[in-house]
Each structure stands twice: as structure tokens, then as C-alpha cells.
Amino acid sequence: LNESNILEFSGGFTGRFANPDNRRRKRMDSKFLLEADYWSDLNNRNSMGLHSEASFSSVWPEIVWFFCNTPSKKGGETTLCDGIQLWKLLPAKLKLYFLKQPLKYSIEIQLPKTKNYKKKGKQDWITNTLGISGYLDWEENKAYLEVLRYAIYKVENLDSYAFTNHLIADNYNEPQIKNISMASGEAIPDEYIKIIKEKSFEIIYEHNWEKNDVLMIDNKRFMHGRKEFSKNSDRDILTIQTERSAFKG
């Protein structure tokens, strides 16, 4: 596999690709093949905490792909955490807490510039996805959404729950996330976040990249992150998001 055919390869497992992330650069003139890394880390280390890709979004990909053109000489490992194992490790009080109601992600999205200057004011956001509400502000050219989604996901073929979300991510890397709370508006206790992080560290796996490596990640079961690497590194990792896999009819 290489940069020129990885998209075609991933297409064999894909029913529909996810819409592109406009923060990332496109490759091979494709809106679905993107550079994985972008410099938004405020402390300039370019590390990233564990998260399920776009778990706060109206479109939550089923599969995330990574392809390595050039590994970093030092650092830059991709971290992985099995959400099923993490859920099993959490104490009962946390399980009861996250089972009782969904999370609420408050999202603000900068929209691409449009040539349609006739639209004014606000317009309701229409979606077929349960738990999504909000509106478009055409004068600000932004979308404001509230996304209700449980912190756990039922992995049907295994009859298990996976703890996969954005709760322990470094959310300064996600400027569109303005707040995360419970659906009721209740703030999530810092103590709970601390416990989740500690338990995730017990089972975290680090993938050391080699040229032409491919990772195909079940995004609703596994969370992933990235270890620190130098901004001057020639690390070149590409990413693709499969919104809906081809495994289902």
C-alpha cells in the first residue's frame, strides 16, 4: 500500500466516507484523504489525549484509518485504548453515572465561506440523527449545535459496552467543543475524569510507526491519541474516515 492507493483500499471496507475535516490539508486531490497532523496544540508539543474521532459530531465515523508515509524519528506514537476493557475497569459508581443519561456536547462550527449572500438570520439545523439540535447563523457563518450522546457505545456483535467519547481528550485541540456536561447540564466531577484517565493508562497501547504501516481502527470501540513529537519532525501520517462501513447491509 502507498499514498496513491490507500483510499481505494479503504473504499473496499467503506459504504460511505465521512465529510472532510477542513482543518486538515487534502492529499492526492481527494477531499477524503487528509494529513492527520495539524498544529493546534497550545503548548506546542502536538500531543493528543485519548478520544473517539468526532464522537461529539453529528457524524460519528465507524472506522478511522491512518497510513504512515514517514514516521517521526522520535515520538509521535499513536496511542490506543480498548473502550470495552476500559468500561470493565471503571468502578460501579461511574458506570451508574454514565448509564443514567447522555453527555451533552455544546458545539460551535465555523462554516465554509458561501457565495449564497441571500441568506440572513438563523435557520434550524435539520438532521436525521437522534439527539442533535441547533441552528445555523448565516450572519456569523457558524453552526451552533447541542449533541446528546452516551459516553458508552453498545458493541452489538460482542454484546458489550465500550467507553468511547471525548471526555479525556485534550479539548484545546478541538476548538469547536465549547463545553461538555451531562444532558441535564450537570458538570462532570473532576474526580471522575481523573479516575477514567488513570484506568486508561493501565491498558493503553502505543503503536510505533514504520513506513507504510496502516491502522484500521474501530472508532466506536477504540479511542486513540498521539504522543508528543517535535514540530520540526518530518512525520507524515495520512488519515481517512469511514462514516459507514461496508460490513452492514
Mark where each language-model region is.
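Active-site environment of non-heme Fe oxygenases that use a 2-His-1-carboxylate facial triad
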Residues: 29-39, 44-50, 59-249
